[in-house]
């Protein structure tokens, strides 16, 4: 019993020493990170690289902060970029976040700079620490020209699930032309990303009507969204009635329930135009609508092209094509 206080005294000393050591180590990490930033701002690349090596371990030999080549690419200064390349600057220099000059050129939509970099050996599928490729950046900026050039040089149109998806980014921002180019290059129109869902689901979430319409025209599954959440669920949470009409015209199931057991109608704001639109579509569809859906289902995803080959009367053809 007499040793009790001594034991607890030593225990408290040990805990205090451990906590002090932990916070001291954390303070050093923070200090080194701030010092790295200081050297980057001052332009001392070698010292910044050395400090980054200490913090992050095995950094590639091709590491650099935002170099003059990055700046030229980001600002679309083609002559300056070509001059730097001619002087022997490595086109694959990357920042601490693995951002290359090609990433910068594509994010700015500077197709001439992107092409010059690619012609001089830039990695077309380089990935940043955030999982972004140059193609993702091109879709982010909405540069269809950059998207075409990247694909011409071998960019992967559809990437692994853990990487940022170019088509989802294009749809999210309403860049329909970029979306169509990717789909023409065999990207799965119903590709589901765990945190985002399918391209159609994203289009409905962000109310990109043009993208919703085009995806449905090209055969996107009208009920495939994010797990049990359908595109109609996503649209019901928003305020765009046109998206509701498009989805229901293409046969969206109003009775489908999500993981919480809710239908699209349950998610619509009370007494809103979206709720009214869903209520109006709850009844049995017209026979003509059922026939149209049946014909399109039989023709499959390529029905948009197949319908033209049936040589139907123009009014009927236009009806089947939702025109």
Curated annotation (Swiss-Prot):
It comes from the Eukaryota. GO terms for molecular function: ubiquitin-like ligase-substrate adaptor activity. This is Ankyrin repeat and SOCS box protein 11. ANK repeats lie at residues 64-93, 97-126, 130-159, 162-191, 195-224, 227-256. GO terms for biological process: endoplasmic reticulum unfolded protein response; positive regulation of protein catabolic process; proteasome-mediated ubiquitin-dependent protein catabolic process; protein K11-linked ubiquitination; protein ubiquitination. Keywords: ANK repeat, Endoplasmic reticulum, Repeat, Ubl conjugation pathway. Substrate-recognition component of the ECS(ASB11) complex, composed of ASB11, CUL5, ELOB, ELOC and RNF7/RBX2. Its main location: endoplasmic reticulum. Belongs to the ankyrin SOCS box (ASB) family. PROSITE patterns: ANK_REP_REGION, ANK_REPEAT, SOCS. Residues 273-323 form the SOCS box domain. It is found in: Endoplasmic reticulum. It comes from Homo sapiens (Human). Substrate-recognition component of a cullin-5-RING E3 ubiquitin-protein ligase complex (ECS complex, also named CRL5 complex), which mediates the ubiquitination and subsequent proteasomal degradation of target proteins, such as BIK, DIRAS2 and RPN1. The ECS(ASB11) complex acts as a regulator of the endoplasmic reticulum unfolded protein response by mediating ubiquitination and degradation of BIK. Pathway: Protein modification; protein ubiquitination. InterPro entries: Ankyrin-SOCS_box_domain (IPR051573), Ankyrin_rpt (IPR002110), Ankyrin_rpt-contain_sf (IPR036770), ASB9/11_SOCS (IPR037333), SOCS_box (IPR001496), SOCS_box-like_dom_sf (IPR036036).
